[in-house]
Amino acid sequence: KAWQGMPSRKDIGTDKWEQTTEYINDNFYFIDMERYTLDSVLKKGAELVKRKGIKCLVIDPFNKVRDLDSNNGDVNVYTLEYLTKIEMFAKKYDVLVIIVAHPTKMYKDSNGKIEEPTMYNIKGGGEWYDASYHGLLVHRDYEKKTTKVKVLKVKFQNLGENGGEAFFTWEPKSGCYIPHSEPIPENTIMPWE
């Protein structure tokens, strides 16, 4: 971690601040457009592969980057076409593409806890599971103040295990999620609170 703790207002403009800003600007590229379409994002991604040598493209969130070429009203067909375009881009440019896709509204179970979503809870349901190579769940447990990362799908079993999971806690001093090992004190303030 470049900062070794969370920066404060007094850090703005210091050498360390400038060094960190330079690192971010040299290693992260934000595609900022007035209107996002899948084709325009992939075109800009291809440009960044050629000019900057990027190896990873993150689309966050999925529902804000629309595929305007799709004329099909069927959400499953739309999702399949969307994922196919991304797969073709990833193979052509040898780039990892990560799509952040939020589930539809999740309801509480009989114990009052929010149900854990699956890939089928994303709009376009089964296509997310069928057409993607990998699927990870990131799910918060507000009571335990932990975040679970669970493998929902691995296409090639030598790359991971379906159902594998790890738990993390937010460490405010560093601004990082760290592996969860002990109970968290009840008065700890979490970033989503």
Each model region followed by its residue ranges:
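Phosphate-binding/switch loop-helix module in NTP-utilizing enzymes
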Residues: 29-92
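Hydrophobic/aromatic beta-strand patches that form the interior of the parallel beta-sheet core
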Residues: 29-31, 98, 136
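A short helix-to-beta-strand connector/capping loop
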Residues: 18-29
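Short, active-site-adjacent cap segments at secondary-structure transitions
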Residues: 64-66, 104-108
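Short, ordered loop/turn segments at secondary-structure junctions
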Residues: 62, 102-103, 140-141
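C-terminal regions of RecA-like/P-loop NTPase motor modules
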Residues: 2-11, 15, 23, 38-57, ...
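Structural recognition of the conserved hydrophobic beta-strand(s) that form the central parallel beta-sheet
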Residues: 58-59, 95-102
